[in-house]
Amino acid sequence: MALLQIAEPGQSAAPHQHRLAVGIDLGTTNSLVAAVRSGETATLPDELGQHSLPSIVRYTQDSVEVGALAALSSAQDPQNTIVSVKRFMGRSLADIKAGEQSFPYEFAESENGLPLFVTPQGQVNPVQVSAEILRPLIARAEKTLGGELQGVVITVPAYFDDAQRQGTKDAAALLGVKVLRLLNEPTAAAIAYGLDSKQEGVIAIYDLGGGTFDISILRLNRGVFEVLATGGDSALGGDDFDHLLQAHMQQVWQLSDIDSQLSRQLLIESRRVKEALTDAAETEAKVILADGTELTQIVTKAEFDAMIAALVKKTIASCRRTLRDAGVTTDEVLETVMVGGSTRVPLVREQVEAFFGKPPLTSIDPDRVVAIGAAIQADILVGNKPESDLLLLDVIPLSLGIETMGGLVEKVVSRNTTIPVARAQEFTTFKDGQTAMAFHVVQGERELVADCRSLARFTLKGIPPLAAGAAHIRVTFQVDADGLLSVTAMEKSTGVQSSIQVKPSFGLSDTEIATMLKDSMKYAKDDIGRRMLAEQQVEAARVLESLHAALAKDGDLLNADERGQIDAIMANVAQVAAGDDADAIKLAIEKLDEQTQDFAARRMDNSIRVAFKGQSIDNI
């Protein structure tokens, strides 16, 4: 929804006053900034006419170089030249070191396990490096547009988790820039095409950038963009094509034990070769060694296709899974939008066309389409298009829930629910006199907490000391437009509440998401059985707890024989509950309930006698 224009009494809002806002595609390989000017949306070039800014930052003793200048020095100073920093956002140092890819950087570890780059200017984290990439883009926009920006929309991969999204917002905050919204990259592409082409129906967004792959299935209907399902791989992109080419060239030239400088030189040449093979059947690769030796080799398109075929096949497999999640077939997909520079690779376009059965859309530059969509959205959010009824409905990738007794998961917000969203559910106390309740927020599709991902823990204190089950605690999950989660617990009678904003310290890759989804399907039958067992065990514990309290208070209402029978059945329930037969536990509980019905009736009669003792009929 656009912001309203408000004027002082007696004055009118100035309809001609244009607020300055831009869209930024903070990419793994390149970044762009775009704006709406005179009704036209376009990316903004720098003084040299270059639209894209290489997402590269080099730290020297005296300065910070960003973009093309940093790229020029990357081969000579790889240790202090940070490329593809987006891949480090929200990830732990342990995760990075455990990965297959090696990096030329010297790392240190922060207190919470996140990576720090050791540079001539000290230790910097991925958020600070990202801020350095944003800095020239913001400066370029303000110089071109002629004023201070009132807000920006920054795009992120659809599979970025809360920590990665928050890191992106923090990078902008370091520069004092207001983030109007974080927008999923596929959704931004849909805006760019949807508004221009007035598309309605199901559309696939195939986004293959430098470091990430996202596939999103969207339904476009009268200005509403609803993401039906998302999938992809946050560790697969054009960078991986480059590394395969580099490995091929090293093998042909029989290069081993290469230093970081030569490795960077090879990587740069690999990218050039990849781009050349977009239009040519073959091209010559060339590097010069430190001793002046010149190495050359011919690389053909057929060879390159063979190298990357498995990776391209992985993206198609993700497309197939995501279509299944969305509940649609390829026949229902009206168009496929290509996003990201890596979609220029001929094999990628050929495979996408073969899978979806129609040529993909490429009328908007795939490198610029995301920035253009973000700019359109920024223009709306800042209030320049109050007539716009554009609505964005993104989805969350994994279900969110609360741990309940027995280690069970109570899902509050289901997977693929559109956001922003707010869902509430009521819980109660387990024991008499309970005055506090611990909450464990989890993420995942499995039935037991042990098989899900822990997000956060917090405690609600000040619950009135009532009987078990008498207190009512309302737990509300809110996921905002940026995908950030807030959980609030409130005791209804007193209004006492506690809340937490979930910002996981570690990132969650889409590979892990895919694994969690596969496991939920693979173990579905076992999980249901384990859940049924846990539920019966919890119910047995609740019944025994309640009955122990009742016997302690009113046990004198029973004679010795009656008490003995109840004690024996209670012992049997406890014994059976320790086993793994849910049906046997349920049967034992029912038998105990039947045996104690007369005791419950006596307790009720006794309570009534005590309540009315000493009162006259008139008082009653």
Swiss-Prot record:
Q: By its UniProt entry, which Pfam families does this protein fall under?
A: HSP70
Gene Ontology molecular functions: ATP binding; ATP hydrolysis activity; ATP-dependent protein folding chaperone; unfolded protein binding
Which superkingdom, per the lineage?
Answer: Bacteria
Q: Which controlled-vocabulary keywords does the entry list?
A: ATP-binding, Chaperone, Nucleotide-binding
The answer to whether UniProt assigns keyword ATP-binding to this entry is yes
Its transmembrane ranges are none
GO BP field: iron-sulfur cluster assembly
Q: Which Gene3D superfamilies match?
A: 1.20.1270.10, 3.30.420.40, Actin, Chain A, domain 4, Substrate Binding Domain Of DNAk, Chain A, domain 1
**HAMAP family according to UniProt:** HscA
What this chain does, per the entry, is described as: Chaperone involved in the maturation of iron-sulfur cluster-containing proteins. Has a low intrinsic ATPase activity which is markedly stimulated by HscB.
Q: In which family does this protein belong, per the annotation?
A: Belongs to the heat shock protein 70 family.
Q: Can you say what this protein is called?
A: Chaperone protein HscA homolog
UniProt lists the gene as hscA
